[in-house]
């Protein structure tokens, strides 16, 4: 079983407009509301793929109830209730652009943070892999993911971390390391304080930096150019075919789902990397975020090339 953690979930609201007019009324006909947050995208893709998945995080208010009520019944909802209201994130789709308005989310108390920590420990009993995705809610310290990873490691669970900024830096500087991290080039550049490109030799060099010591897998997203990955002392380039993209939103989360599935099933390096990239591409071919059409899986799987470099 795979446990997905979304500490700062949201209701994602989409407003499609032919034109966004400022300082006046804009009327929307076709409004879409879905449970949002990176970890919930991971949950839905794992569910589409047929994995047994358990979802947790911090939710509150009517927005939190909406999330529970609108997840597929086959996803085991094990969320921790807090007093604040779960946030709403608005995407205005207009003239080929996407303007986003993102709420910060609720402020968690010390008691609520401690309560979730105990809740997390309880959920690990029947789990093989834990995914930790997205931003931390207000009130949680930057090193909170480090705390959860330590608990998971002590219980023999593999962890996949997909976050950025201070939360990622705190984990890299801490004593307990995740099994996998999945930065993109921009996040890698931010971590290292210098611009990184798709130069394989340069990537090889920086991924051997002591900053990443103790992390078994480092999987760097190169966008439409695939992936550059390091597993222990072996490096891989994953070459993906060109596809028609409907929406790339959530494709990174779908890739995380593939990584988690590969770890849960003890797959070899090439199988894990191929599955992860296929799921990311399948999500990009769909209008709905965090959804994959498995009818296209085998064809894409055969088109991906994993090379040791």
Swiss-Prot record:
Alphabetical list of SUPFAM superfamilies matching this protein: Ribokinase-like (SSF53613)
Disulfide cysteine pairs (residue numbers): none
CDD domains tied to this protein: FruK_PfkB_like
Top EC group: transferase
Gene3D superfamilies: 3.40.1190.20
A Pfam family matched in the record: PfkB
UniProt-recorded name of the protein: Tagatose-6-phosphate kinase
Organism: Streptococcus pyogenes serotype M28 (strain MGAS6180)
């Amino acid at each position: 079983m795979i446990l997905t953690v979304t500490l700062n979930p949201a209701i994602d609201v989409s407003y499609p407009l032919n034109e966004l007019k400022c300082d006046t009324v804009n009327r929307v006909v076709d409004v879409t509301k879905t449970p949002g947050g990176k970890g919930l995208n991971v949950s839905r893709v794992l569910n589409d793929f047929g994995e047994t998945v358990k979802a947790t995080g911090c939710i509150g208010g009517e927005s939190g109830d909406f999330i529970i009520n609108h997840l597929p019944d086959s996803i085991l909802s094990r969320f921790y209730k807090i007093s604040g209201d779960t946030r709403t994130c608005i995407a205005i789709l207009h003239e080929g652009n996407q303007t986003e308005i993102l709420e910060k989310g609720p402020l968690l108390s010390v008691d609520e943070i401690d309560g979730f920590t105990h809740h997390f420990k309880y959920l690990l009993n029947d789990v093989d892999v834990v995914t930790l995705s997205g931003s931390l809610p207000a009130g949680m310290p930057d090193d909170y993911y480090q705390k959860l990873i330590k608990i998971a490691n002590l219980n023999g669970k593999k962890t996949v971390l997909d976050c950025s900024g201070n939360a990622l830096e705190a984990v890299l500087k801490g004593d307990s390391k995740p099994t996998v991290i999945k930065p993109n080039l921009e996040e890698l550049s931010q971590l290292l304080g210098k611009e990184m490109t798709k130069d394989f030799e340069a990537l090889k060099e920086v991924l051997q930096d002591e900053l990443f010591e103790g992390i078994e897998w480092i999987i760097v997203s190169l966008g439409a150019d695939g992936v550059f990955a390091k597993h222990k002392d072996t490096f891989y380039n994953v070459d993906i075919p060109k596809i028609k993209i409907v929406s790339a939103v959530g494709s990174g989360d779908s890739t995380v789902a593939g990584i988690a599935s590969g770890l849960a099933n003890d797959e070899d390096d090439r199988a894990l990397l191929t599955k992860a990239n296929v799921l990311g591409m399948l999500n990009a071919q769909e209008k709905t975020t965090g959804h994959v059409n498995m009818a296209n899986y085998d064809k894409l799987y055969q088109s991906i090339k994993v090379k040791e470099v």
